[in-house]
């Protein structure tokens, strides 16, 4: 069992980022609702209090009872967490004269304090709060200030309790990782959470959990399901059967390429060609949500049919990852949404769930995959929607439209790799628009399809910026598509960020 850090979630948008930063420092942590501290746990080394959208003095603000936490564990309050500690200890928190958002610099630092070891005056931090601590309790000592915020950081004398009104977890706080590492050292953390240690402990747990039972797993070709398959295969070998469904909406040659990759990994995979079924059921359907539902139900039907051909299956493997687990519970403990990679499977299957990746963030899944010896092109694949090209064809879906989009997308992705751009992009693809336009090819007038290129940079898909790809690259892609893809005479580039736009068009 790994020792762990507990992050109490008060509803901040950056709570998961705190968790990722701690994990990057090789320390295992768990994010739990603010009022669900695991008091019975014996392996907790320290506690972080997250930010929150509330003000501490709001009637509906989330309030935690810290009486059994403070003094027993080292505590670090971040933003709202820092204000909550001060406010509940007798300090004052009030609306700031001007809201503090964006970059600031530390103008005063107590270099003797353990939390700020190795951090110097001038260090850039990131503020994001509308309130400020105006009066600290008597035993709270200011250890860092900015020109505008006196209590940018404090230490509670006589306790291993600290608060910072800035966000060390965000990229813009240049010494934020150093501060978090200092806190882990204060907690006495061994920092032994590594891909290798995760694989060793998880494989052992899977062997004990599954014994000689048989497991089925739906593969998508994506990172999560692929790493799940390799981990399960390492634990139970031939007792794992994987099913990979070709719904006719994969990228060009993807079914054959992915099947070859899985064979190379030694996986037992059943490949199912279900193109005709999906094309028939999608014929004439234009409404995006209806398309999604048809594709989702079709996949479940095919998977269920194949699963029933197998004997003595006891478990369903899924590539659920930690953000799915966190998001499935609100911080009040009520279910918001259920996350199932194979959602809606018939109850008659009566299978137990096994989710080997449920403790990992996405970047950790990739590192585990690399440690398992998986090929880089499998590990570094861009996210690809479950409905595939079905939501990149605006309007109704036909085999001819799929052919056009596959050819255009293949050119875009191939050139992106050739130019060394693929690994710099979070997600990219081509969208076939329900628009035709006039063009001229040779001496003839054409009236053909328009495609849009999409590429974004991101760290978590919650927000995304459109990628500023080189003009020369875009010109090359446009020229290649128009000359080589029959049925396309115009290429445009989507320069919308998320928000307000989403990454996918449907």
Curated annotation (Swiss-Prot):
UniProt-listed Enzyme Commission number(s): 6.3.5.2
The protein, known as: GMP synthase [glutamine-hydrolyzing]
A cellular-component GO term for this protein: cytosol
Domain named GMPS ATP-PPase: residues: 193-381
Taxonomic placement: Bacteria, Pseudomonadati, Bacteroidota, Bacteroidia, Bacteroidales
Domain Glutamine amidotransferase type-1 span(s) in chain numbering: 4-192
Species of origin: Parabacteroides distasonis (strain ATCC 8503 / DSM 20701 / CIP 104284 / JCM 5825 / NCTC 11152)
Pfam family name, one: GMP_synt_C
CDD domains xref list: GATase1_GMP_Synthase (cd01742), GMP_synthase_C (cd01997)
Class of the enzyme per the UniProt entry, highest EC level: ligase
Physiological role: Catalyzes the synthesis of GMP from XMP.
GO molecular function (one): ATP binding
Active site: 79 (nucleophile), 167, 169
């Amino acid at each position: 069992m790994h020792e762990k850090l507990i992050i109490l979630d008060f509803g901040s948008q950056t709570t998961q980022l705190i968790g990722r930063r701690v994990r990057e420092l090789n320390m295992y942590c768990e994010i739990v609702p603010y009022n669900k501290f695991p008091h019975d746990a014996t392996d907790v080394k320290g506690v972080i209090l997250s930010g929150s959208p509330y003000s501490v003095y709001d009637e509906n603000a989330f309030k935690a009872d810290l009486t059994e936490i403070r003094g027993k564990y080292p505590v670090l309050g971040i933003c709202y967490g820092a204000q909550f500690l001060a406010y509940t200890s007798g300090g004052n928190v009030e609306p700031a004269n001007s809201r503090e958002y964006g970059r600031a610099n530390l103008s005063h630092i107590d270099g003797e304090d353990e939390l700020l070891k190795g951090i110097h005056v001038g260090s850039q931090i990131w503020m994001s709060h509308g309130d400020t601590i105006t009066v600290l309790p008597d035993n709270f000592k200011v250890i860092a200030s900015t020109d505008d915020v006196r209590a940018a950081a404090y230490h509670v004398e006589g306790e291993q309790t600290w608060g910072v009104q800035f966000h060390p977890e965000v990229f813009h706080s240049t010494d934020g990782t150093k501060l978090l590492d200092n806190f882990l050292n204060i907690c006495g953390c061994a920092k032994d959470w590594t891909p290798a240690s995760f694989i060793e402990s998880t494989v052992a747990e899977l062997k004990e959990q599954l014994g000689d039972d048989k497991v089925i797993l739906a593969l998508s070709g994506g990172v999560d399901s692929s790493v799940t398959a390799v981990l399960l295969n390492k634990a139970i070998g031939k007792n794992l059967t994987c099913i990979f469904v070709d719904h006719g909406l994969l990228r060009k040659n993807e079914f054959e390429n992915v099947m070859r990759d899985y064979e190379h990994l030694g996986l037992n995979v059943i490949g199912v060609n279900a193109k005709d079924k999906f094309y028939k059921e999608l014929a004439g359907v234009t409404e995006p949500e209806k398309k999604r539902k048809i594709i989702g139900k079709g996949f479940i039907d095919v998977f269920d049919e194949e699963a029933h051909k197998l004997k003595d299956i006891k478990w369903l493997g899924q590539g659920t990852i930690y953000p799915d687990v966190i998001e499935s519970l609100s911080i009040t403990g009520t279910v918001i949404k259920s996350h199932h990679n194979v959602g809606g499977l018939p109850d008659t299957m009566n299978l137990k769930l096994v989710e080997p990746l449920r403790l990992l963030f996405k970047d950790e899944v990739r590192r585990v995959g690399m440690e398992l010896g998986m090929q880089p092109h499998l590990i570094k694949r861009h996210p690809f929607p479950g409905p595939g090209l079905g939501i990149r064809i605006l309007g109704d879906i036909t085999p001819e439209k799929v052919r056009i989009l596959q050819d255009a997308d293949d050119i875009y992705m191939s050139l992106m790799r050739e130019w060394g751009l693929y690994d710099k992009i979070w997600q990219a693809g081509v969208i076939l628009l329900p628009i035709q336009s006039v063009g001229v090819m040779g001496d003839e007038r054409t009236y053909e399809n328009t495609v849009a290129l999409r590429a974004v940079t991101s760290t978590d898909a919650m927000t995304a910026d459109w990628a500023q790809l080189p003009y020369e690259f875009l010109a090359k892609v446009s020229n290649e598509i128009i000359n080589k893809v029959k049925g396309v005479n115009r290429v445009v580039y989507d320069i919308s960020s998320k928000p307000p736009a989403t990454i996918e068009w449907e």
